[in-house]
Curated annotation (Swiss-Prot):
Coiled coil: none annotated. Glycans are attached at residues 517, 602, 722. Cadherins are calcium-dependent cell adhesion proteins. They preferentially interact with themselves in a homophilic manner in connecting cells; cadherins may thus contribute to the sorting of heterogeneous cell types. GO terms for biological process: adherens junction organization; calcium-dependent cell-cell adhesion via plasma membrane cell adhesion molecules; cell migration; cell morphogenesis; cell-cell adhesion mediated by cadherin; cell-cell junction assembly; homophilic cell adhesion via plasma membrane adhesion molecules. Residues 808-829 are cytoplasmic. It comes from Oryctolagus cuniculus. Three calcium ions are usually bound at the interface of each cadherin domain and rigidify the connections, imparting a strong curvature to the full-length ectodomain. One of its GO terms (cellular component) is adherens junction. This is Cadherin-16. Residues 25-126, 131-235, 242-336, 341-449, 455-564, 569-665 form the Cadherin domain. It is a single-pass type I membrane protein. PROSITE patterns: CADHERIN_1, CADHERIN_2. Residues 666-786 are annotated as: Ectodomain G.
Amino acid sequence: MVPAWLWLLCFSVPQALVEVSPTTLHVEVPENYGGNFPLYLTKLPWPHKEAGGRVVLSGDSGVAAEGPFSVEAESGFLLVTRALDREEQAEYQIQVTLEAEDGHVLWGPQSVTVHVKDENDQVPQFSQALYSARLSQGTRPGVPFLFLEASDGDEPGTANSDLRFHILSQTPAQPSPDVFRLEPRLGALALSPEGSAGFDHALEGPYQLLVQVKDMGDQASGHQATATVEISIVESTWTPLEPVHLAENLKVPYPHHLAQVHWSGGDVHYRLESQPPGPFDVDTEGKLYVTGELDREAQEQYVLQVQAQNSRGEDYAEPLELHVVVTDENDHAPVCPPRGPPVSVPELSPPGTAVTTLSAEDADAPGSPNSHVVYRLLSPEPQEGPEGGAFQLDPTSGSVSLGAAPLEAGQNMLLQVLAVDLAGAEAGLSSTCEVAVTVTDVNDHAPEFTSSQVGPVSLPEDTEPGTLVATLTATDADLEPAFRLMDFTIEAGDGEGTFGLDWEPDSGHVQLYLLKNLSYEAAPSHTVVVVVRNVVETVGPGPGPGATATVTVLVEKVMPPPRLEQKSYEADIPVNAPAGSFLLTIQPAEPWNGALRFSLVNDSEGWFCIQKVSGEVHTARPLQGARPGDSYTVLVEAQDADAPRLSTSAALVIHFLRAPPAPALPLAPMPSRHLCTPRQDHGVLIPAPSEDPDMATGHGPYSFALGPNPTVQRDWRLQPLNDSHAFLTLALHWVEPREHIVPVVVSQDARVWQLPVRVVVCRCNTEGECMRKVGRMKGMPTKLSAVGILVGTLAAIGFFLILIFTHLALARKKDLDAPADNVPLKAAA
């Protein structure tokens, strides 16, 4: 018994026994204290001066007004008034407050935690006084088959509750006194190696064990308790399993029972492992199940390992193996190989030539009917008849070869082959395989010319070498570009090498060129034979008649071209010369057998023109933009009208002169003439002003032109007749009938005159005489009087007609009223 003053001394030293925290005081009290009470626990941090008031204790349910704790108001000591039991309550939470009479808090609250220190006052207890267990023969040594359970009411984790298990006795003691082994800390009962060796020969037992549990750990002192364990030894039922054959895609309710295992010992848990993992399970009774459909193509066989384990997952014995073999069902159709690039078959290949071999894969069991694949050609369908189809198919090997029907180059065909398992039975699964076939070309066609006869082609004998004579075209029915390459040669008709060939091998066109000068006297004609051949050797028959083309060339004798009087010409003209002014005449140097046609070239300004037949050069329009002192060059070309290739040319240089002064004496208007409208074949003859000796001093011909007025040039046409006269006619079909003043410009050398020509345009009769409108004659009736006379005449005629018809009517009536006897004889007849 510890004296009270000692406890007071201990609790008065906070540094030793009291754990002080900023907010909570911790105090430890031994349970079942046997000393005097009250027991001083600790001194609270009470106010230094008497504050008065009352002390209030509050806390958990173990602290009440009549509870085991109190506070001495004078000293501030916390007291416990009776013994505490840790098993009843291990800890108390207290709050101490000093309050005034009115409830006002003077001090606190102060939290205090009281820990009840454990004493070894509890005896261990087994969960059962008698344990029963079954031990199967074949149990591995060291694997617990029974777990003893005991409890101690003292504080966990302390020596007071640290339990140890021991076997006190074993009955019977055969074959060894240590048949079993008990794990001291866990209470796990297992077979010892000595006991396991004994059980291999014969069954023993039952066994009875007296076991003990003691607290205080490995210390000699402590409380203890005992229990009895009865162990029966049973024969092992852990026997190997026969393989199970299970059909794939089995349509049964799942889970589906496969087999059952049984561990004859007690406290067993079954565990299942599948290699590879599969849809399998085991229940608490050891029944094995498949939980879903199996697929043989995914996994042909499973190895199931079943383990019998204790509650800690330790195997009692070696696992049992169950082999599950998945049997095949015809659940997979043949799989065709992927469609590859087209298979090339040469044209003209003989029947039986191998094309390709199909190999459809069936995922069902190899060697079984489910994977026995046969083949059938779907497209193109086999044809009846002596030739048969274009392809043949071996139904067993899937080999495709050529049939007797011919194939054409360039054909692209798609073969469809049906692959059927179950050796082609009706219930077999099938797939359609496709093979693309292309018939490649061979050089079995010789090239041929599109035309075997060309010409005749006429060439002048002065034709320059290098001139193209003719172009020949050849075709080749082959498709391959390499087989269409052609080579051309001159086979006959060109012994002197007068002609040559030029071509591109892949063009199909060949040009026949002239290589040497022709001679009409040496050979007036040539017959050139050209042959075409393939560059690549032809398969089959050689070139036919179409491979030869004949070109006929006729040589024309060359005539010399015409010559002009001069190699170049020069002429002068004032810059104000009107349109139609004469410059000069171009003449050939010698008479030409044919007709010459003249033309101007390089007249960029369009100032001049030349008569095609006569060669006279005139101004085509006013020389606007020309400056005195400048020169203008055009090219005069003369060609034979029948042979345009016979031509010559000469340069015409025109010098522009300053405009001469206008004549001082104006011309008198010419007397008026008349023309008919609508236009008839009549005109007005305009002479040159030769009457005036001052104006007719020139020596050259006269030129006539219309004035620059656009309306005049539109309505009238002026044609020169000779060097001194011109002919004026209407240019339009209809011109307004009236008197017109037509300005005509006349020029001679550098002198210019303007003649105002009076022309009366009128309507004409058939003889071409002008019908002129006349004025009203004296005494001629007016329109009104003429109408009156006409109306009066018609009225008089009408009046006389009325009298006549009235008289006739009255006479007829008188005749009808007379008696019959008075009718004249002539009338009666």
